[in-house]
Amino acid sequence: MDTPRPIKRALLSVSDKAGIVEFAQRLSEKGVDLLSTGGTAKLLAENGIKVTEVSDYTGHPEIMDGRVKTLHPKVHGGILARRGIDEVVMDENGISAIDMVVVNLYPFANAVSDENCSLENAIENIDIGGPTMVRAAAKNHKDVTIVVNASDYERVLTELDNNNDSLTYKTRFDLAIAAYEHTASYDGMIANYFGKMLPAYGETESKASLENKVKFPRTFNSQFIKTQDLRYGENSHQDAAFYKEENPEEASVSTATQLQGKALSYNNIADTDAALECVKEFDEPACVIVKHANPCGVAIGDDILAAYEGAYKTDPTSAFGGIIAFNRELDADTAEAIVSRQFVEVIIAPSVSDAAAQIVAAKPNLRLLECGQWDNKTTGFDFKRVNGGLLVQDTDQGRVTSDDLTVVTKRQPTDEEMRDLQFCWKVAKFVKSNAIVYVKNSSTIGVGAGQMSRVYSAKVAGIKAADENLEVKGSVMASDAFFPFRDGLDAAAEAGITAVIQPGGSMRDDEVIAAADEHNIAMVFTGMRHFRH
């Protein structure tokens, strides 16, 4: 099984033609006979590369508008033939061995991503012959090489150059795994696409008429690609790795470029994601500092230095060893303020100035990430693994504007309070429930996270503010869910809160509103909850 296999005949049929001409030219120079189909054969011939059309090889033309091209015993017999076993059968049927298959599949994902794609067009972009050849070659990897990724062309050529025009079993096996991953992803995309259309079955072929398709398909297929093994997971006794989606969202922790620092840990990645997604909520220059997936300081300012100063003063103790995210370029002044003041695990920003990078370089272990700019169009699903199952939901993209707010108390919030309330609400969305956030002048002054009762989260927020000598009087408060009792309002009033934002919807809303009126607190309802677990 470990015997290297020479490459004497290759079949090339690709939708993505990047690099295929150069690859085929090198194979041809090595004396490899090339078989090809349709557009690939035409492209190779136009570039002066000797190639035999599969239809000429099989003696059977492409039929049904190209639906049937390679589905022929001379093709699949040549791929599946077991060397040393099937030669007699091959000779009897005029079948030649095919040693390498180079195939990538019809661009189904690209086709259906077009909102004008009809069901008929989607169907025509389902590859049949391609996956069949890929699976056949992967199955027979003992004798046949399968290449599905253009990124592997150079690797294959290099090994052929260094190994007497042969490929090792190790390489063939590795490429076979890549082939199965490729077809699994492809079939998963098709299953997801059609699985969402179940309610509309038989109605029409127009995608526009399928707007009532289900959001969650009958089976959920998603492929993630391992980008790195991690030293350990949340704890040192847990093994871990980091995987990213096939087409990850831009400006995310999965696509960020690490400019310097130690390798990211499991907790670094999780906390950096929490910080980055929170800072994306703000249009103004903003800074978010996260510890254990909770914001411990958030602020906006005229620039990111002012925002950092505001976020840091919320809770300098918790900020130690935290993650810092910005929604503007990291500049030299802000970088200097950070490295001269605190120990930080990760800094992430859309971009990093050269001067800032030089300053951070003085702390070589500090992980500095550049994520690029975003367009505030985060979509997709959140996943939560449970024993034996998977919970899937939309990402929480719920946002409110001043038009969505209902003032339910006798006193109206002032303009300044209203600005702080809306800021406070954005922060509360990213704090673990039960979440209470105190804000003053567009900066958090106390965060109460993860308490089992809402009133204790309110007390924790007040304690945190007091510990840092921050003045609560005149600040506002956000609660991620309704107050089941008036005690949360009483605690807020005792701390000096003057305005509150919350979803409303409690059976005791009247009691809570009465408590707010008693304390002359202005209160607004959002009608939207932001539980986070």
UniProtKB/Swiss-Prot annotation:
Gene Ontology MF, one: IMP cyclohydrolase activity
Its pathway is: Purine metabolism; IMP biosynthesis via de novo pathway; 5-formamido-1-(5-phospho-D-ribosyl)imidazole-4-carboxamide from 5-amino-1-(5-phospho-D-ribosyl)imidazole-4-carboxamide (10-formyl THF route): step 1/1; Purine metabolism; IMP biosynthesis via de novo pathway; IMP from 5-formamido-1-(5-phospho-D-ribosyl)imidazole-4-carboxamide: step 1/1
Say if the entry is tagged with keyword Transmembrane.
no
| Pfam families assigned | AICARFT_IMPCHas, MGS
PROSITE patterns cross-referenced by the UniProt entry = MGS
Specify the MGS-like domain's residue ranges.
1-148
| Gene Ontology terms describing biological process | 'de novo' IMP biosynthetic process
Task: For this UniProt record, give its keywords in alphabetical order, as a comma-separated list.
Answer: Hydrolase, Multifunctional enzyme, Purine biosynthesis, Transferase
Q: Which cysteines are joined by disulfide bonds?
A: none
Q: Which InterPro entries match?
A: AICAR_Tfase_dup_dom_sf, Cytidine_deaminase-like, MGS-like_dom, MGS-like_dom_sf, PurH-like
Q: Which reaction does it catalyse?
A: (6R)-10-formyltetrahydrofolate + 5-amino-1-(5-phospho-beta-D-ribosyl)imidazole-4-carboxamide = 5-formamido-1-(5-phospho-D-ribosyl)imidazole-4-carboxamide + (6S)-5,6,7,8-tetrahydrofolate; IMP + H2O = 5-formamido-1-(5-phospho-D-ribosyl)imidazole-4-carboxamide
According to its UniProt record, the EC number is 2.1.2.3, 3.5.4.10
Q: Name one GO cellular component term.
A: cytosol
Homology family = Belongs to the PurH family.
Q: What is known of its domains?
A: The IMP cyclohydrolase activity resides in the N-terminal region.
**What's the protein name?**
Bifunctional purine biosynthesis protein PurH
What organism is recorded for this protein? Colwellia psychrerythraea (strain 34H / ATCC BAA-681) (Vibrio psychroerythus)
